[in-house]
Curated annotation (Swiss-Prot):
Protein name per UniProt: 3-methyl-2-oxobutanoate hydroxymethyltransferase
One cellular-component annotation, GO: cytoplasm
Organism: Cupriavidus taiwanensis (strain DSM 17343 / BCRC 17206 / CCUG 44338 / CIP 107171 / LMG 19424 / R1) (Ralstonia taiwanensis (strain LMG 19424))
Source taxonomy: Bacteria, Pseudomonadati, Pseudomonadota, Betaproteobacteria, Burkholderiales
Subcellular compartments: Cytoplasm
Biological process according to GO: pantothenate biosynthetic process
Residues given in the record as 3-methyl-2-oxobutanoate binding sites: 53-54, 92, 120
UniProt cross-references to Pfam families, sorted A to Z: Pantoate_transf
Length: 273
């Protein structure tokens, strides 16, 4: 199938995302790992497409994202980039590929040459020098804080972050430090909704939430989760958008609409402190 985009749809750039955030217009983001789904998401009006290392879970059947390699991320980025026309395409730097600023830059260059327009890194304020190094060298960055799946063993499992006073204070420091280092987007995962809303208000850049409440600038889900086709455990923050829909396209459009009108995430998809 060939998707004919609305000719009025403009290419989504970092300044466009910032303008959406400033205007209070919600940003819809989903994952895609191949050309066909990237084309469909773009056609349905998704502003950001993430080639996530979650492909380790939903494409490879891994229990964690840790086994995913840079070469695999580059391959899937190339595939998704061929299908995407206007959405902003970002790609995860996989586990172990950004221990130093220089290593992070080399890894990011590989992904940018494969078609990524931004890279995503997981971590806290300790990442600031790496983010600064990348941004100074024209690599756009999305900083991922809160529950960082690459740290699953260090965190003791997939647990909500920022529930204690100390944990909340650390997330506030993380967000501000990463913004100051130059991150153009901050993604928060599994963070109490009130805290995520507070952090969003404290930042000048857009925030994207996954299990972080409705007050973030936008939302993201793993495509296979929101289509209810992943056989693993369903996280609390996931909603089945295929329910009652006649097609995958309709489900994706329902997701975009729900993000835009603020009906997703609802209270049952969020966490409290």
């Amino acid at each position: 199938m060939s998707y004919l985009l609305d000719p009025s749809r403009k290419t989504i750039t970092i300044p466009k995302l910032q303008a959406m955030r400033d205007a209070g217009e919600k940003i819809a983001m989903l994952t895609a790992y191949d050309s066909s789904f990237a084309a469909l998401l773009d056609y349905c009006g998704v502003e950001m497409i993430l080639v996530g290392d979650s492909l380790g879970n939903v494409m490879q059947g891994q229990q964690t994202t840790l086994p995913v390699t840079l070469e695999q991320m580059a391959y899937h980025t190339e595939c998704a980039a061929r299908g995407n026309q206007t959405a902003l395409l970002l790609t995860d730097l996989p586990f172990g590929t950004y221990p130093t600023p220089e290593a992070a830059f080399a890894s990011a260059v590989t992904l940018m040459k494969a078609g990524a327009q931004m890279v995503k890194l997981e971590g806290g304020d300790w990442l600031a020098p790496i983010v600064k190094f990348l941004v100074e060298r024209s690599i756009p960055v999305c900083a991922h804080i809160g529950l960082t799946p690459q740290s699953v063993h260090a965190l003791g499992g997939f647990k909500v972050q920022g529930k204690t006073d100390a944990g909340a204070a650390q997330l506030r420091r993380d967000a501000l430090a990463l913004q100051a280092a130059g991150a153009q987007v901050v993604l928060m995962e599994a963070v109490p909704a009130a805290l995520a809303g507070e952090i969003t208000q404290s930042l000048a850049v857009p925030t994207i939430g996954i299990g972080a409440g409705a007050d973030c600038s936008g939302q993201v889900l793993v495509l296979q989760d929101m289509l209810n086709i992943y056989p693993g455990r369903k996280a609390k923050f996931v909603r089945n958008f295929m329910d009652g829909q006649p097609s995958i396209e309709a489900a994706v459009r329902a997701y975009v609409a729900a993000v835009k009108d603020g009906s997703f995430p609802a209270a049952e998809h969020t966490f409290s402190a």
